[in-house]
């Protein structure tokens, strides 16, 4: 096993990324402005809804949604009594390593009962309040001392009774906020508890009440839109050229797994079309051109099945089993809600609500091959201090050790890196490189304009539509041959791709849905499923 092949792939990928950066992405400036105006108005609407609901939940206690401490009190109905002791108890904060860089401290470990006792004994219940005007300062927040002659001093002092706010908040017996229950020490922060969208969304499958669920959904939407406006809309506005093009910088050596990242602007974490339609602003550089996108179906799940040789994964892929429906049944949620949890166990997901943990246990039992492989990865990391992929790519874990609970440190990374690395740092680049070669060999005007994790995006010239579809299909389905040529790997997992095309990157129509299954013969032939006669000839 050698890193030479990985280095060669990286160099080939660098040439392709250079072409993509130089080609750039065309932006519809008018659509971008319309999007910004529309969602800026939506954030104003959501903020009004959130403030009204927060007032109902907290009484007269003011809540600043930009304050992590206020959000923690609102969602969890508890307030930290001593922040210094709190940080020490849960080992919250950062430390400087031997290289001088800062990193998060390793959190203290608790079982569920001990954690519950620890956080409750170090926080106080938050109650609703009733506001009244301070009688000392008459609501002005400041007072004056009376001089010996009976007149008031000109010097004004902050009122001690109301701390300068002019209002007295009197507690009543009703609990304030939404009374969420933190699950582990990882949910603790310096100000209380986590209130990020990922954490809050996990509570939507719990029995927390309709008001809490409605508020979480509204807050997560508000928070997401603010992030999207800042990251994508403002990012595009800063990077766009006078000719309405952006040229993102793609990087192979930033993420720990080797997955691509990009900046100026960030185009690797694009939101789904139904979440934030920024993709509508991406159009073809030709007046009657098209945007063509090819996606791999369940790429990381299939890669996990291949690396672990899990027979259940092979069987379900070949039969077209809907894995999200299994998740939905186990968690008693809709299929759409289930999607966020389906593949979490691939990366070591074990904690969460009761329903989530029930599903995670069922996943481990159903996909016993993946579970056994996860255990073997942990053993390999402990023994060799590194993990090696079939491609030769290595991930170092010099400080990995056993925990007192029987697991290993860096458990999530040990499970995640091989899957994400082989899928998006090995397989996807091979397809991208081969597709770029096909475009050049056919002297196409159409260009690859973007790639996002498990997809390839083409800007298609209007006269090259059919050929571009065929070449992209061929490029994406080249994984079997490319694995064999580059690494002498027999990639035996069926490959599924979906192609969509449209006038912009949002409004795409499905045009192709293929499943390719490698045969077991030494000639390495493939079975083509759902492919037209014309495409079969071209491929």
PLM ranges: what are they?
Residues 474-486:
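A common structural junction motif
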Residues 2, 21, 25-33, 214-219, ...:
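Glycine- and acidic
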Residues 72-73, 167-169, 257, 262, ...:
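Flexible loop/turn segments at secondary-structure boundaries
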């Amino acid at each position: 096993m050698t890193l030479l092949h990985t280095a060669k792939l990286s160099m080939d990928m660098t040439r392709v990324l250079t072409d993509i950066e130089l080609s750039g992405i065309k932006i519809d400036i008018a659509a971008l402005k319309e999007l910004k105006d529309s969602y800026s108005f939506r954030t104003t609407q959501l903020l009004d809804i959130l403030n009204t609901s927060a007032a109902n939940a907290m009484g007269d206690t003011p809540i600043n949604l930009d304050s992590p401490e206020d959000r923690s009190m609102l969602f969890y109905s508890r307030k930290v009594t001593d922040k210094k002791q709190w940080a020490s108890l849960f080992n919250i904060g950062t430390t400087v390593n031997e290289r001088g860089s800062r990193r998060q401290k390793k959190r203290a470990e608790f079982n569920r009962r001990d954690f519950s006792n620890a956080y409750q004994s170090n926080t106080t219940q938050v109650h609703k309040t009733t506001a009244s005007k301070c009688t000392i300062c008459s609501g002005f927040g400041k007072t004056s001392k009376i001089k010996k002659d009976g007149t008031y001093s000109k010097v004004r002092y902050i009122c001690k009774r109301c701390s300068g706010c002019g209002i007295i908040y009197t507690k009543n017996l009703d609990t304030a906020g939404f009374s969420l229950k933190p699950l582990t020490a990882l949910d603790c922060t310096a100000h209380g508890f986590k209130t990020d969208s990922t954490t809050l969304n996990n509570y939507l499958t719990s029995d927390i009440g309709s008001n809490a669920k409605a508020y979480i959904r509204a807050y997560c939407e508000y928070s997401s839109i603010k992030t999207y406006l800042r990251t994508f809309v403002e990012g595009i506005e800063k990077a766009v050229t006078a000719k309405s093009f952006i040229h993102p910088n793609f990087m192979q050596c930033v993420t720990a797994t080797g997955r691509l990242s990009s900046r100026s602007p960030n185009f690797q974490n694009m939101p789904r079309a139904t979440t934030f339609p920024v993709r509508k602003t991406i159009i073809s550089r030709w007046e009657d051109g098209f945007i063509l996108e090819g996606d791999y179906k369940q790429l990381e799940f299939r890669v996990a099945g291949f690396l672990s040789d899990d027979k259940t994964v092979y069987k379900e892929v070949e039969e077209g089993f809907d894995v999200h429906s299994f998740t939905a049944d186990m968690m008693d949620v809709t299929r759409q809600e289930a999607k966020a949890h389906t593949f979490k166990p691939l990366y070591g997901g074990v904690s969460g609500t009761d329903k989530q943990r029930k599903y995670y246990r069922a996943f481990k039992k159903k996909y016993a091959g993946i579970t056994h492989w996860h255990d073997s990865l942990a053993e390999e990391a402990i023994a060799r201090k590194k993990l090696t992929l079939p491609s030769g790519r290595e991930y170092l874990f010099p400080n990995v050790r056993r925990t007192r609970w029987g697991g290993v440190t860096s458990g999530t990374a040990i499970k995640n890196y091989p899957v994400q690395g082989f899928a998006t740092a090995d397989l996807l680049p091979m397809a991208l490189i081969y597709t770029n070669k096909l475009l050049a060999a056919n002297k196409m005007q159409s260009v690859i304009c973007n790639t996002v994790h498990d997809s390839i995006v083409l800007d298609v010239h209007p006269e090259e539509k059919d050929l571009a579809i065929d070449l992209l299909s061929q490029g994406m389905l080249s994984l079997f041959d490319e694995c064999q040529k580059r690494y002498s790997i027999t990639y035996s997992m069926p490959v599924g791709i979906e192609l969509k095309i449209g006038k912009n990157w949002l409004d795409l129509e499905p045009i192709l849905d293929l499943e390719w299954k490698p045969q077991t013969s030494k000639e390495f032939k493939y079975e083509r499923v759902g492919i037209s006669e014309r495409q079969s000839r071209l491929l």
